[in-house]
Amino acid sequence: MPPGPRGVASGKPVISGQDQKYTLADSSKDLEGIAHMAIVDSLSPLHISLSSLESAWNNLLNIASQEDYSIPELSIPKIDVKSILSCKPKYSPKYPVVLQYISDHYVQVQDHIANAKELTEGLKFVSQLIMYKKIDHDTLASVSKMLSNYLTDYASTISSLKSVVCQDQTAPSHPMDESYMDTPLSMILKGTMPTGAGVDKGFALGGGGVGKGFNLNGGGVGKGFDLNGGGVGKGFDLNGGGVGKGFDLNGGGVGKGFDLNGGGVGKGFALGGGGVGKGFSLTGGGVGREVEIKDW
């Protein structure tokens, strides 16, 4: 076999400007590293501020114990991380939405960080007051309550992650709960594609149409038509009325005829007073023995 063109490695792609030994696995690891950095940068400032707050609180308790001061216990809400880890996810993959949540709640997270730092400095000052016996028990109780309130506020923000990550098991189930997992191709094959294709014997004006029914605004099923949520059976109803085999745009319509503006008879229909045959077309397509309105 003759040698390939100069500068092209036989059997391996050339990665411009990089070591040719750099593999797809290496690229994947680099991407993973970037993802980890994003998570760390998003959460580490809050984690660090909470760690400093914990250290200042523990130091305060030690000093208070040495000086025979009693401090009410903190009320610390539990963040149920276990249920978040084990719950049925809303989306797949499960956890990327956490980064979006943190981004959406950036202001609250920054407030938690700033408040934690202020409380840390406050606890250090209170520790000094205890050492010099310049503080009373009521003030210590207020300090404990203030810190408990902060932890409740912080825990509320973090616990709300569960509603973002996890499905609500108390909500009623819906047959399309996991439709977000459908690919466009599978949706077309199932007849549920929201834009771009009618399937089977249905019609699609705004893109969909399923089975033999027709539905523009959320209603019609079976062989009926429904533009505004009503008509069923073999009738057609634009404004909430006509049933049976008739057709009614403005409230009347009888027999097997169609009437848009007061005319059409027989098995045909009239938009402006004409049109016959057994089919019809609103946009130039139609099926069967239709007539095309735009050609009249």
Swiss-Prot record:
Keyword terms of this UniProt record: Cleavage on pair of basic residues
Propeptide boundaries: 1-134, 146-190, 290-296
Superkingdom field: Eukaryota
Function: Causes stimulation of sperm respiration and motility through intracellular alkalinization, transient elevations of cAMP, cGMP and calcium levels in sperm cells, and transient activation and subsequent inactivation of the membrane form of guanylate cyclase.
Protein name: Sperm-activating peptides
Species of origin: Strongylocentrotus purpuratus
